[in-house]
Amino acid sequence: MTLDPVLARIDADLPVAIDRLFGLLRIPSISTDPAFKADCDRAADWLVEDLRSIGVEASKRPTPGHPMVVGHVDGEGPHLLFYGHYDVQPVDPLDLWDAPPFEPRIEDTPNGKVMRGRGTSDDKGQLMTFIEACRAWKAVHGKLPCKITFFLEGEEESGSPSLIPFMEKNAAELKSDIALICDTSMVSPGVPSIASQLRGMLKDEFTLTGPRIDLHSGHYGGPALNPLAEIARIVAALHDDQGRVTVPGFYEGVYEISDNLRAQWGACGFDEETYLNSVGFTQSHGEAGYSTLELQWARPTLEINGLWGGYQGAGSKTVIPSKAHCKFTCRLVGDQDPDALRDRIRAHVESLLRPDCKIKWDTDLEGSPAPVMNTERPEFEQARKALSDEWSREAVLVGMGGSIPIAGFFKSVLGMDAMLIGFANDDDAIHSPNEKYDVESFHKGIRSWARILAELSA
């Protein structure tokens, strides 16, 4: 089966492929909010029907949360599993969007045409690059070049609570030669990238309670403990003035990268100034003594994601609030153990409490360790060749600052290696207002997967 007519078909069908993606993007499949449960079901149904349209035996599989979509195409050669997720992040704050987030559109920008809307880059646009590549192969040759299993999740943005039980229950069905994941970005625009390591994730949150009820700040101001002031003091104490996390044992299992790897990352084409300026920074912040890429890819973090309490309405209300709340996450590297680290963080926070300040922790949040990819597998070199041919420059092996738990679960649950290839850019504003995905990334992403399928099936 020849590749050139497949690439020509992709080029000709690009407008139709964008319209098809827009149909999926219009479904507000926000997994973390129960109000959107029906929409997550609709997105799963949409994908089942779309996969069936290209000859995939696809079905929606129930879980205690949102459904999985699983599909199979038989064929010769290697057995590949493709993973993506159809759920998206919440759209708050809505007033910062330039247009409704679930009304996708094409925009002209100084850097070319982009698709704008929630899920364009994370991850609906990305997962559809693979499906569109398969569609083109099917249209031109009547079949796909190899055996493929499709595994599409609906809870990635809400911690994947159903993922491991589903994988364990369906291990025999999902087991493949290698997993392909399209949920990552390129190190710089136009630089094709294969992720060789990611960071793990730990989530937690707590509530501080001071007085039993909100108090009059005149009657009690002075002698009363203010939980908002206490939570601010505690949060500020979690880092020192060099940006290091102060939790005892936090850096256990963290390793320095080699000089060779540091040199490779330094030569990968990363534009630090553009990366920082795009979000309003003039310099890198964080742990002292490390480059921006090292901070993003090889160092752990403890980030405060939300801090609130007291009166939030218009005007003023002179109260000392009863409660204050904090949400935080940690990005993990190396051999950091999320369960052990959670215990250490909680113990440290509790050691900072003053008398009469009570704490309650969330009990339902899970963590995942940092996965490392087996780049010695021949599929990595085959994919690098395919990507280099499409983008007319050498593909690079990079780290990723984000967390994709499924990458580690394929190894720990199914004994499979994974390869992460994505076409997003750092300025795509994923998880933020005005998320976008470059039309070029979508187009060349489809072509890239078509080439990768050809290489892996040769």
How would you describe each model-predicted region?
Residues 77-152, 444:
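Active-site metal-coordination/substrate-binding segment of hydrolases
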Residues 190, 215-219, 366-368, 428-441:
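Short beta-alpha connecting loops at secondary-structure transitions
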Residues 233, 309, 314-344:
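C-terminal catalytic subdomain
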